[in-house]
């Protein structure tokens, strides 16, 4: 159906009234699609700080601050408070279709020596029990039911990197990092005969390796190469998947091995596929190729710190401009295989609030408009719509100040969240810069024949916009924001040229057309990794109501369900590797391919491979390559590494934790690569190893 604003010029009044009364305000969010969030808007909630719906479960004593004057302590927010704000329409009217809640598991009860508490949910004690200050399992079930019945998905935070604060020399420090399995002590930090934890001191963040195998600050760091810990954490997340969660945000992914996390994702996707994204913090202007590699290879998306930091630099302090922002958009589309699955934001619990005291809220409004019309999965931090202020932790975690539905930002979010549900260009479309200078950025998102054109002026003077071209068809277009940010109408000519117009100072306009696509067009595939038999969901347009077929390259997959906009299939029994997916409708019309789905050899386990006496010259690194897809299929360009040699083992012994197929007879060798790409192979026979069905292992061999 064409954009209503284009039709207004020609429809008789009586017919127009009928259409307005019949038209839904937004497409209903599909809570059954747990792997595609590209058209959703996530609302991040620090559970303890949002709303106290049940005072009877509040803490007592030293860990509780009743008036929340001590932001390091519990303040009383709980799941009932979230339920209440769903039921009274605050979140649904805002257009929220997913909530990201604090880790729901039981956390430590002890007061940290510095006066801190576990209100934030990141100091886990027992992953198979709830945090009683948020609620019990029946409360959690009610939260899930309430959210789902209102078209809202639920994402949980998850911390498989560490338990809680601990000191090796002081068992009385907090709770000594103790971790429990449904009430039964597994172990603690200072008495660790089963080696559940790393005991390598704290990281100085000097290298990727150092940040993985040493403690993050004073947090007891799990040894994820320990089979007990590996199985406990994987069992625990399955418990919450069985409780109905729709997504997972994984904390501190930079501080765990990619190999173990890939095995975790394989486990999740085999059990209950849900959208999963991790936190890999990047500072302002920081670009990390390892970050891109992780997002492309681990099976997990990431919080898009490049997006978040750049938009803050443009609109908070002016240290960057729209040229820098556009460059970031272009480069990340190249660097991330699935850029539309990266989770975008303007602020969160680990950085200062976007709004700050004694400043205009206008740039917050502009930032929200850009966030909600850009590629990626947009996330709103609780209270941003109320212009909450605050510096770094804990000031950025103040209690929710108000639930006012009349703020400008609330209206902007509500309007654009609805547009995101209705127009697939915002979820699936590519980004094209159409007009730019330091103050002005006009960009277009398109998918099939659906188009959204957004114009932003962050400067203090208006601009005359000449020579703007667009993919919008001929017609007049009104501002979808309805002048919330001083937008205007535009006229598009038959050749795509837009008539000259004035773009207001600190103004934003959004123009759009929504067109159904007649032939099949894939917008999203999720997850993008899986073994034979796993379920994969394909969303897009023009698939038709009658069942067609889905191809992985030229191999047919079993169709589990089919509709015009969503298909579920089973990964076919094909050789492990990367495949391009296409949809063929019942009329034999075939879609363009959706590239690089990875078929795994089978279930995955994380194994530490190590090699002694591998001496190298400066600038040369060690890699591993072998006989399965997960080891590069003997292709040195796809070898795994570079390997490590500083913490768990020291040079000339090298090691790396790698996700490999379970119960598989592996053959492999180590190779040396210099900075020019020259390769030196090991001599002798291939190393051999049969992987276990579950758990972890370490394999140590000598260089040949």
UniProtKB/Swiss-Prot annotation:
Sequence positions that bind substrate: 122-123, 162, 215-218, 249, 254-255, 349, 393, 397
Which N-terminal stretch is annotated as signal sequence? 1-29
Localization, per the record, is: Secreted
Superkingdom field: Bacteria
Per UniProt, the cofactor note for this protein states: Binds 2 calcium ions per subunit.
Q: Where is the active site?
A: 251, 279
Positions binding Ca(2+) 2 in this chain are 161, 212, 221, 255
Positions marked as site (Transition state stabilizer): 350
Reactions catalysed: Cyclizes part of a (1->4)-alpha-D-glucan chain by formation of a (1->4)-alpha-D-glucosidic bond
What are the alphabetically sorted keywords of the record? Calcium, Disulfide bond, Glycosyltransferase, Metal-binding, Secreted, Signal, Transferase
Co-factor(s): Ca(2+)
Molecular function terms, GO-annotated: alpha-amylase activity; cyclomaltodextrin glucanotransferase activity; metal ion binding; starch binding
Quote the InterPro entries the UniProt record gives: A-amylase_C, Alpha_amylase, Carb-bd-like_fold, CBM20, Glyco_hydro_13_cat_dom, Glyco_hydro_b, Glycoside_hydrolase_SF, Ig-like_fold
Q: Where does Ca(2+) 1 bind?
A: 52, 57-58, 76, 78
What are the IPT/TIG domain coordinates in residue numbering? 520-598
Class of this enzyme? transferase
Gene Ontology biological process:
carbohydrate metabolic process
Where the record annotates domain CBM20, the positions are 599-704
Q: Give the family this protein belongs to, as stated in its UniProt record.
A: Belongs to the glycosyl hydrolase 13 family.
Q: What is known of its domains?
A: May consist of two protein domains: the one in the N-terminal side cleaves the alpha-1,4-glucosidic bond in starch, and the other in the C-terminal side catalyzes other activities, including the reconstitution of an alpha-1,4-glucosidic linkage for cyclizing the maltooligosaccharide produced.
Name of the protein this chain belongs to: Cyclomaltodextrin glucanotransferase
Task: Please name the source species.
Answer: Bacillus ohbensis
Q: What is the lineage of its organism?
A: Bacteria, Bacillati, Bacillota, Bacilli, Bacillales
Gene from which the chain derives: cgt
């Amino acid at each position: 159906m064409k954009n209503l604003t284009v039709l207004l010029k020609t429809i008789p009044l009586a017919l127009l009234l009928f259409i307005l009364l019949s038209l839904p305000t937004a497409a209903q969010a599909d809570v059954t699609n747990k792997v595609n969030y590209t058209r959703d808007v996530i609302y991040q909630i620090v559970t303890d700080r949002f709303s106290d719906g049940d005072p009877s479960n509040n803490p007592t004593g030293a860990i509780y601050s009743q008036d929340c004057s001590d932001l390091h302590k519990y303040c009383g927010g709980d799941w009932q408070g979230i339920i209440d704000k769903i039921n009274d329409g605050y979140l649904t009217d805002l257009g929220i279709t997913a909530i990201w809640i604090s880790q729901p598991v039981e956390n430590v009860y002890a007061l940290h020596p510095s006066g801190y508490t576990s209100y934030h949910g990141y100091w886990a004690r027992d992953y198979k029990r709830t945090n009683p200050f948020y609620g019990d399992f029946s409360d959690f079930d009610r939260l899930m039911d309430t959210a789902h019945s209102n078209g809202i998905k639920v994402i949980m935070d998850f911390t498989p990197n560490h338990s809680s604060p601990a000191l090796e020399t002081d068992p009385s420090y907090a709770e000594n990092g103790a971790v429990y399995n449904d009430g039964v002590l597994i172990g603690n930090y200072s008495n660790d005969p089963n080696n559940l934890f790393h005991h390598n001191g704290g990281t100085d963040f000097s290298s990727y390796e150092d940040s993985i195998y040493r403690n993050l600050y004073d947090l007891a760091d799990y040894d994820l190469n320990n089979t007990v810990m590996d199985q406990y954490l994987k069992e625990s997340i399955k418990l919450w998947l069985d409780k109905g969660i729709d997504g997972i945000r994984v904390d501190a992914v930079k501080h765990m091995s990619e190999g173990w996390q890939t095995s975790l994702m394989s486990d999740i996707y085999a059990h209950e596929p849900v959208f999963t994204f991790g936190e890999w913090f990047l500072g302002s202007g920081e670009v990390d190729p390892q970050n891109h590699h992780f997002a492309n290879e681990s099976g997990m998306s990431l919080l898009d710190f490049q997006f978040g930091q750049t938009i803050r630099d443009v609109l908070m302090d002016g240290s960057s401009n729209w040229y820098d922002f556009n460059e970031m958009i272009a480069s990340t589309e190249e660097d991330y295989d699935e850029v539309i699955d990266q989770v975008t934001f303007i602020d969160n619990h680990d950085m200062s609030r976007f709004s700050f005291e004694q400043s205009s809220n206008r740039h917050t409004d502009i930032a929200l408009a850009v966030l909600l019309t850009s590629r990626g999965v947009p996330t709103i931090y609780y209270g941003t719509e109320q212009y909450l202020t605050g510096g770094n932790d804990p000031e950025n975690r103040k209690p929710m100040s108000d639930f006012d539905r009349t703020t400008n930002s609330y209206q902007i979010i509500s309007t654009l969240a609805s547009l995101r549900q209705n127009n697939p260009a915002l979820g699936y479309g590519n980004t094209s810069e159409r007009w730019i200078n330091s103050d002005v950025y006009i960009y277009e998102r398109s998918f099939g024949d659906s188009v959204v054109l957004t114009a932003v002026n962050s400067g203090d003077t208006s601009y005359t916009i000449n020579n703007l071209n667009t993919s919008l068809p001929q017609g007049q277009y009104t501002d979808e924001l309805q002048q919330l940010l001083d937008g205007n109408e535009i006229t598009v000519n038959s050749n795509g040229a837009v008539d000259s117009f004035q773009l207001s100072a600190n103004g934003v306009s959004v123009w759009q057309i929504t067109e159904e696509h007649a032939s099949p067009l894939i917008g999203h595939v999720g997850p993008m990794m899986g073994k034979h038999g796993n379920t994969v969901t394909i969303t897009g347009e023009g698939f038709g109501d009658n069942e067609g077929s889905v191809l992985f390259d030229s191999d047919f997959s079993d169709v589990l369900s089919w509709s015009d906009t969503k298909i579920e299939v089973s990964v076919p029994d094909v050789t492990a590797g990367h495949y391009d997916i296409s949809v063929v409708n019942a009329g034999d019309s075939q879609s363009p391919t959706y590239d690089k789905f990875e078929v795994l050899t089978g279930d995955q386990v994380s194994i530490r491979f190590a090699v002694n006496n591998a001496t190298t010259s400066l600038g040369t690194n060690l890699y591993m390559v072998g006989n399965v897809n997960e080891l590069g299929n003997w292709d040195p360009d796809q070898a795994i590494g570079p390997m490590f040699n500083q913490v768990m083992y020291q040079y000339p012994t090298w090691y790396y934790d790698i996700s490999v197929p379970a119960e598989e007879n592996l053959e492999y060798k180590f190779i040396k690569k210099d900075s020019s790409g020259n390769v030196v192979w090991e001599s002798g026979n291939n190393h051999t190893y049969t992987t276990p069905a579950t758990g972890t292992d370490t394999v140590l061999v000598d260089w040949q």
